[in-house]
Amino acid sequence: WDYINSVSDAMAWDQFFINPNIESIGMTYGYMKNYEDRVRRAVNTPDSKGNYALWQGGMEPNIPVGSTEGVSASMEKALAGAERELKEGASGKWVAHWKMVHIVRPVWEKSGKANQMGRSFEKLSYTQEDADGLIHLDSAPRTIRGARNLLSVGLQYGNAFGQGMQAAALKPADFFGNDNVLYLMEDMATGEIRLSILW
């Protein structure tokens, strides 16, 4: 996820590199998909002694409090994300809210394996196509509301951090009062990523 910040900073000089609305940048989006693929292949490549690292999946930021429809839709999305990560080779996942444990843990329990260390993956390659994939922008919406959302959550996190909180439950101000849009747990990466995308 933090790769959004890295690639946005690295490409800040390029006037044609404009990220879409942050809601579109999931782990299956353009450069994120290619980045994750390289990570999983690198992590699952043994060292000179045959030892493997453990690839842990991403963080599930949903806080399951809201309308029935909103919670249901978010849980379906979280479950699909966990199942995708298991398929891709992750050995687990971490959650921002304890209520999410019973949603994602069964995904790995039903696999019947303690982890996926040593799973065979295609070896890393270092081609121009690989490099281009790490900055690839898929077609996705770029709207004023998207910019407002970036700014809104970034300012909210700055306020929370200034009060001594390292993490906070946030959502864009445009959705205050809309219980179909859940709060997400945000941390310092939120400020870095959102500011990087904005500039």
What are the residue ranges of the model-derived segments?
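Conserved alpha/beta-domain cores
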Residues: W1-W199
